[in-house]
C-alpha cells in the first residue's frame, strides 16, 4: 500500500455548490436574497472576510476573493449614511469580483444596495445566526471542502469504536475479513475505495466511503453484497477517524514477524503518523478476532497507557531481580 501520496486539494467550489450543500451537515440555513448566476462565482479560500475597511473606502489590501460577511457593524455603518453615500460605500465592495455576500443576525440590505449587488452579479444571502456562529460554521464547511484528501484501496471498519483501516495486496481477503467483522457486530465505513481527509493542520484523519460504491461490497465467488440491506443500519457508518492501520501480508516463512509487540510501528498518511500493525495471512488464522484484539489494545493504550508486552516484560524483570536477590542471600 502506497501511503506516500501527498494528497489533493480542491482549488475552488462554485457558490451554487456552497449554497446547496452547506446546510446538509452544518446547522446553518442560508436564505437567497437575489437571483444571479451562482455558477459563475467561485470560492477559492477557506478564510472569510468582514469588509468594514473596504466599505469605508480603503481597498488597497481588500481580500475580495473571500466570502464577505456583513454583520451588525457593517450594516449599521451603511444604514447611518444617506442613499448616495451608501451607494458609494457599497460600490467599493461590489466592484470587485467577490464570491458572495452573507448577511448575519437577520440584518437586511437596503433595496438599492441589493439591486447594485444583482447588477454586479454578486449573490447575496442571509442567515439568522450571529456573525461569530455563522463564520464558525461556514469556515468548518470550507475547511472540509478544501481539506487534504486522498483515495486508498482497502477496507475501513469501526471495530469496538476504533477506526481500523485494512490494507494489503489485492486478493488477500480484505473485504472478506471486513464482512466477518460486520457479522460480529462491527460497522463498515467503506470497502474497496476509502477516502481519507485531513482538515487544515489537524492531526485527525477522517475516512469515508465513495458515494457511488456506498456500503456495497464485492466478495469473490459470491458477488455484490449490500451491507445495509443484509445487516441493517447498525452495520454501517458514514465517517470514522483513522486510528489504526492493519496491513495484511502474505505469509513468508523467511520473514521475521513481530512476536512481542514491543516494537511499535507507524505509518504516515497525509503527513499524520498512524499506528501500524502487520498481520501475516495463512490458512486457519482467525484474522477477525485478532483485529478485535488490535482495537482493544489500542483502547487500553489510549485510555490507560497499558501495553501487554511491556507489562509482561516488567513481570519477567521483577522475577529475575527477585531470583538474584535470593541467590545473594543464600
Curated annotation (Swiss-Prot):
Pfam families: Hpr_kinase_C, Hpr_kinase_N
EC number: 2.7.11.-, 2.7.4.-
Record-level Gene Ontology MF annotations: ATP binding; magnesium ion binding; phosphorelay sensor kinase activity; protein serine/threonine kinase activity; protein serine/threonine/tyrosine kinase activity
UniProt keyword annotations, A-Z: ATP-binding, Kinase, Magnesium, Metal-binding, Multifunctional enzyme, Nucleotide-binding, Serine/threonine-protein kinase, Transferase
Cofactor(s) this protein requires: Mg(2+)
Active site: 153, 174, 192 (proton acceptor), 259
Subunit annotation: Homohexamer.
UniProt cross-references to NCBIfam families, sorted A to Z: hpr-ser (TIGR00679)
Name used for this protein in its record: HPr kinase/phosphorylase
